[in-house]
């Protein structure tokens, strides 16, 4: 978690943003060069306040929302949100670049979407009332060439691609079993539920 990392003395004076997680990822790969290795990066992504989620160099869309909801126009809020997505794209690229020569698969999922309208933002609305953008969110899966060079991994990835092609809905509740299953972990004592593993179907 980035706040824990950034509170360490070795990071004094550094900006607090998601890119610090990429450095930790790279360090972890160096410290643990062998065996199976799961790394979880808990990002802030596009959580409000949006302007706190990206450095000034990524303020492409302007004017931005620099205050609380009712002090900003809807367009200013959208601009700031879009800037945060631009920085997330950069974060993902740096993550993938760190893993291109590794036997790696990456799952990226947000916990919720965001609604922006009439100078306010919303998320976490109860499911029965939440608008579609809050509860229907994309998931991204990326794999390195080295990972895909193995036939078993290629077959697993094809199953993931089929879910996309067929527009099959997937749910967070199956993410744990799918990350482990698609990564090649096994669990003879039933720790991985194959009915929840996207790569097992």
Q: What are these regions, as identified by a protein language model?
A:
Residues 1-201:
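Catalytic domains that recognize anionic headgroups
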